[in-house]
């Protein structure tokens, strides 16, 4: 993540193939915003998130990063991922009965005075 003038942007390091479409979704109390991105060479970067052009309000947010279902992926990515994304596996791969495997992970964020504390939502509560 990176903060600038109260706005926030996210950067994800992964082995997701280049040109794979990704969706960044930021949610908070009375706040939801999304942006589309495309996986780069081991790094994917979101657009800047703001509160309608203003600095983000203090509070708890979640950032979700996900990959669309098989049917809407580019042909190049479909060949790599396989039918219904059967070739992908890992900690952040979830099976969906309708679309097959999808990539999805979440982190919690506490924003306070332009400072960010990140919480791994995959961790067990006892590990925090």
Annotate each PLM feature.
Residues 1-30, 37-40, 45-128:
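Serine/threonine-biased, Pro/acidic-interspersed low-complexity stretches characteristic
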């Amino acid at each position: 993540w990176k903060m600038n003038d109260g706005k926030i942007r996210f950067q994800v390091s992964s082995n997701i193939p280049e040109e794979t479409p990704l969706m960044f979704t930021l949610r908070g109390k009375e706040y939801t915003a999304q942006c589309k991105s495309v996986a780069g060479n081991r790094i994917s970067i979101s657009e800047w998130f703001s509160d309608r052009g203003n600095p983000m309000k203090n509070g708890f947010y979640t950032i979700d990063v996900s990959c669309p279902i098989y049917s809407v992926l580019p042909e190049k990515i479909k060949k790599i991922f396989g039918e219904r994304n059967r070739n992908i596996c890992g900690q952040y791969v979830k099976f969906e009965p309708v679309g097959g495997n999808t990539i999805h992970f979440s982190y919690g964020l506490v924003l306070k005075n332009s400072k960010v504390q990140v919480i791994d939502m995959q961790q067990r509560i006892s590990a925090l």
